[in-house]
Amino acid sequence: MRRIVATSTAIPLKDGAMKRRDLLKAALAIPLLPGLLSGIPAMAQAADPLPARLRSRVRPGEPDWPSAADWGRLKHDVGGRLLKLESPFAGCGPTSAGAACDEALKHLDNPFYRGDQPALTQTSGWVDAWTSQPSAYAVAAEGTADVVAAVNFAREHHLRLVVKGGGHSYQGTSDAPDSLLVWTRHMNEISLHDAFTAQGCAGVQAPQPAVSIGAGAMWIDAYDAVTTRGGRYVQGGGCTTVGVAGLVQSGGFGSFSKHYGMAAAGLLEAEVVTADGRACIANACTHPDLFWAIKGGGGGSLGVVTRLTLRTRELPEFFGGVSGSIKAVSDAAYRALIARVIGFYQSSLFNPHWGEQIGFGSDNTVRVDMVFQGLSQAQAEQAWAPLLDWVRARKEYELVKPIQARALPARYMWDAEFFRQHAPGVQVDDDRPGAPRNHVLWAGDQGQVGWFIHGYKSAWLPASLLRRKQQARLADALFACSRHWGVGLHFNKGLAGAPKAELAAARNTATNPQVLDAFALAIIAGDGPPAFPGMPGPKPDLAHARERAAAMGRAIAALR
């Protein structure tokens, strides 16, 4: 089967088909070269070759690498917040050696610990693509002036510059060897506004409720401030440890994007440090081109975002989820089940109430991991009744895990204390002494912490495939795909079926417009355990990883 899907031009953020609730995010970032060239006259760019110093970055050991005195001046300029980096695994022996190594191994499955280490990333690498390696130095920025100093230093000394907040980039853009890192982790202030008007937009835009968030804040901090304590909603990511700035710059899907749209579309204003070292405000009225570009143009592509202001919305009465799994006894029964699920989704779930995913496994099992908003538990159960009645009436199927709906008052969705009391085990605490009590991770996301990616394929599925005459073709393609690898349909990562206002807002971003016509994003992915250089224990089996990646390639080919 060929050409029935629209493929994305960049691997999208956050979610896998490996029983992950919502893998956070990935932004396709490019160097700051366009900014470096912005001051060169256009005629000169066209007529003369670029100077060699603009064509390459200086590395340690080369004559132009900054001297100790140069680094000392930068350290002074940033108030002492310049760090020389080394991986905590650098001192590990065949089993373990040294306090730093032991501490890193102790917290290997804790993404909050990993995010607090400037030398580590949330992903340890991708076979035949990249391996996590720390920058040479990092500026632990606490304010915009620190970022300006780092950008100027990198430009003047022709260093590669890397930006890291949450450190979730799948493409390895959260780190780079021999580079200078702008580490925004400590720029995590959050302020709520009852009536925000973007700078220069008075009389053009009506004041509206909003939240201003520092570039280093995680979404769990934003949700705690806006929802748990503030009683409102901000569109962000599903994975709680993902950084706010990176997600917005890469488009930004969350569990409820089918109703609230993309995170980037909710951006009202940003402070950005451009490659010439200027801190500027970007919004619809001031630097509108830059404002448009950072809404989905890729994290760190056009400058270093230091602060964002996002609109907030009213909460629905309820958030909730539906989970379970159905197994077919034969290939033929599985093909029929896939077709039934597609028809059921089109008739009952293809609307702004429903998000997250349904997975089709190579073991002839359909796995449901959906969320909903604006419905009661009874209404959610009623919506699923037609499919469950059909399954129960046929001996070819087994409800391996009963499909059940659960709802809770929306304000409790990210309330860690509520879950500790009423649903222990659904969230995992940051277990370090003194850690903030609101720092929790969804238990279903823990498998991604430090993961070593073997393969990650994706394709947006156009809504035209849900038409009655096209559903059989889609079912055939999904079945063929599942013979090679499991595939997850992430409905919240396609905006077809979203409210018209959210479609219009998404259209005014730099995100690939194919998302507007897609009812879901198909994701085919696989990984292995953490594989940071220097870690004790077995090394990744690269031959096996490549075999798995090839199988994923065959699976996505069945969809295309």
Regions found by a protein language model. Name each.
Residues 1-17:
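N-terminal amphipathic/basic-hydrophobic helices that include classical n-h-c signal peptides
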Residues 14, 19-33, 37-560:
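Soluble FAD-dependent oxygen oxidases
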